[in-house]
């Protein structure tokens, strides 16, 4: 089977590797986003997908606009591909491109459609407190993740799973599900199922404002957003930005690590956003709009991530100090 692979981030790498390892599949070319300047040296850095393609000596196309680039469109028209596989590519394909391959354009999407259509399904699913997610393969149409569904696979989200961890799990699941999808499509063993638009929810591009912690929210809601937007959740402390990397909501002692289950919380309260306890081996405890939140891992501006316990021991925190949105 001849495949053109469209993908960009780390999430897409397991699927590309799985396809490359299959002797019945030929990757004609990889289409990925243009290199981006990153880091202190402002160097051009290739996407994770491009790096794999280069290692495997697969031709790479990087149009700024896949819909308008004449060279890319000519190549795709002449590719004689059986399918275009799209995994977190980052650009919308034109109706012309969607109609080119024999089996269509097959997307590996990081949610259980029609929930969490859009650019950031893994992050928003966790940020909104979902306890289950998964992968959907679908035939792409002109809409944003609106095409008929092919196969689904499910996985639970644990209380302390973050977007990086769930994304890694889904990336591997997507690779397996995509191979099964291609095989069954080729043998006409799948009946595409239309999505119910009434059940749709959305996962838009994440904005910098989404990273800001609102301490008036409940501890559980803040915890979910810290996990979902990992490692970017942000507050202000002593006039400086502070990333919050991991938290523990103290709402249900039974869900806490054993060493915390015996803590007496009955006397802890204070102004929203303030430190109400300093647990030397664990971290500061902060009053939220509803409940208490332990800061388990943080990152001061310009520093490496550190445990909440290290913050307590090394920063001379005091009860009553305020974290600001």
UniProtKB/Swiss-Prot annotation:
Enzyme Commission code(s) on record: 2.1.2.9
InterPro entries: Fmt, Formyl_trans_C, Formyl_transf_N, Formyl_transf_N_sf, Formyl_transferase-like_C_sf, GART_AS, Met-tRNA-FMT_C, Met-tRNA-FMT_N
Residue sites binding (6S)-5,6,7,8-tetrahydrofolate per the record: 111-114
Organism domain of life: Bacteria
Name of this protein: Methionyl-tRNA formyltransferase
Family of the protein in this entry: Belongs to the Fmt family.
Function, in words: Attaches a formyl group to the free amino group of methionyl-tRNA(fMet). The formyl group appears to play a dual role in the initiator identity of N-formylmethionyl-tRNA by promoting its recognition by IF2 and preventing the misappropriation of this tRNA by the elongation apparatus.
């Amino acid at each position: 089977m001849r495949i053109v692979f469209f993908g960009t981030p780390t999430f897409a790498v397991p699927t590309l590797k799985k396809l490359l390892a299959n002797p019945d599949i030929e990757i004609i070319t990889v289409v990925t986003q243009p290199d981006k300047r990153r880091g202190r040296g402002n160097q051009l850095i290739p996407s994770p997908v491009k790096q794999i393609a280069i290692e495997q000596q697969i031709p790479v196309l990087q149009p700024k606009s896949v819909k308008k680039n004449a060279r890319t469109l000519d190549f795709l028209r002449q590719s004689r591909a059986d399918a275009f596989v799209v995994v977190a590519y980052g650009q919308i394909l034109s109706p012309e491109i969607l109609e080119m391959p024999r089996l269509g354009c097959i997307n590996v999407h990081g949610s259980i459609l029609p929930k969490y259509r859009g650019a950031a399904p893994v992050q928003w699913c966790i940020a909104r407190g979902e306890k289950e997610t998964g992968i959907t393969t679908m035939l792409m149409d002109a809409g944003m993740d609106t095409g008929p569904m092919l196969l689904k696979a499910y996985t639970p989200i644990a209380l302390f799973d973050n977007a990086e961890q769930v994304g890694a799990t889904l990336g591997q699941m997507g690779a397996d599900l995509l191979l099964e999808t291609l095989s069954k499509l080729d043998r006409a063993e799948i009946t595409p199922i239309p999505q119910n638009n009434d059940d749709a929810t959305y996962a838009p591009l994440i904005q910098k404002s989404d990273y800001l912690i609102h301490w008036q929210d409940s501890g559980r809601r803040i915890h979910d957003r810290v996990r979902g937007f990992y490692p970017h959740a942000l507050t202000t402390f002593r006039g400086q930005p502070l990333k919050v990397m991991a938290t523990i909501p103290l709402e249900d002692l039974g869900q806490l690590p054993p060493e915390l289950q015996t803590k007496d919380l009955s006397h802890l309260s204070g102004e929203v956003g303030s430190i109400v306890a300093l647990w030397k081996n664990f971290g500061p405890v902060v009053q939220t709009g509803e409940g208490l939140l332990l800061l388990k891992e943080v990152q001061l501006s310009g520093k490496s991530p550190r445990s909440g316990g290290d913050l307590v021991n090394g920063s001379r925190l005091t009860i009553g100090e305020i974290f600001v949105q």
